């Protein structure tokens, strides 16, 4: 699929029906959860919450039950902010409804679900800015954490658990993915140590994969490529073989 105008698509994922879903941001983007059709057109699925435009949908994950969780921060964009919060939302494709899933994450970024479908991992990457500033903040307040939320039977989230706190000095996590054992692969953007950091489901650091430039996202291939980790960093796309195959929530697991 090629799109000359992707509507500022960021996070992408293909559902069980083979449709590509996208989180479309601001800065002349669509500001919505959308489907990218086979001819590259952006087809909005949901554009508002309680009648107000989303800030700038950033990343998404499809739960095995079909729910779409997507993050809605604002890093760039000249459009006025209509919502007074930056949250994780859950879209239900059966009822065609959208629900606010979090109220205790100040600026959510990457999002991924555990292989058993019981936990939602959310990267909190708060640079203290709204995206409307004309000049960079001199002393931004940063909140950089990796969080785990239990997923209830109705798709709502339970109490947040902070798995890792990266302090308030450098940038934290962007996109994430998981392997079939539930380990989390996070695109870590700290200037002093950027690359892919692998965490256990409990938040223990297991491995570090340096990248040539600041990474933005990562995902595993499928089929024969299931153990290959693909990484976007700077203007490049990189790959590295891994010992454990990746997990895709919307696809069946190869056994």
Q: For each predicted feature, which ranges?
A:
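Blade-edge beta-strand/turn elements of extracellular beta-propeller
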Residues: 1-5, 39-51, 87-107, 150-169, ...
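Beta-rich, blade/repeat-based domains predominating
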Residues: 5-24, 30, 50-68, 85-87, ...
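Short consensus segments that form the blades of beta-propeller domains
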Residues: 24, 77-82, 132-140
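A short loop-to-beta-strand structural motif that recurs across blades of beta-propeller domains
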Residues: 31-34, 86-89, 145-147, 195-197, ...
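Hydrophobic alpha-helical segments and helix pairs
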Residues: 35-98
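Short loop/turn segments immediately following beta-strands, especially the blade-tip
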Residues: 139, 148-156, 241-248
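Blade-level signature of beta-propeller repeat domains, shared across WD40, Kelch, NHL, RCC1
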Residues: 217-255
């Amino acid at each position: 699929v090629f799109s000359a105008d992707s509507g500022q698509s960021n996070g992408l994922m293909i559902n069980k029906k083979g449709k590509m879903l996208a989180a479309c941001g601001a800065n002349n983007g669509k500001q919505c959860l959308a489907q990218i059709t086979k001819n590259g057109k952006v087809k909005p699925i949901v554009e508002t919450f309680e009648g107000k435009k989303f800030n700038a949908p950033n990343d998404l994950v499809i739960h095995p039950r079909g729910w779409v969780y997507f993050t809605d921060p604002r890093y760039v964009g000249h459009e006025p902010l209509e919502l007074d919060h930056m949250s994780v939302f859950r879209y239900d494709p059966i009822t065609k409804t959208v629900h606010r899933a979090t109220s205790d994450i100040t600026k959510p970024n990457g999002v991924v679900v555990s292989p058993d479908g019981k936990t939602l991992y959310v990267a909190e990457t708060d640079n203290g800015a709204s995206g409307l500033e004309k000049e960079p903040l001199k002393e931004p307040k940063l909140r950089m954490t990796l969080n785990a939320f239990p997923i209830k039977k109705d798709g709502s989230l339970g109490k947040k658990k902070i798995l890792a706190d990266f302090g308030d000095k450098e940038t934290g996590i962007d996109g994430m993915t998981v392997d079939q054992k539930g380990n989390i692969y996070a695109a870590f953007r700290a200037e002093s140590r950027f690359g892919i950091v692998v965490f256990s489901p409990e938040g223990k650091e297991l491995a570090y994969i340096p990248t040539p430039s600041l990474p933005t996202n990562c995902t595993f291939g499928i089929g024969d490529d299931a153990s290959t980790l693909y990484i976007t960093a700077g203007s490049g796309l990189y790959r590295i073989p891994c010992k454990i195959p990746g997990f895709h929530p919307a696809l069946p697991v190869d056994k």
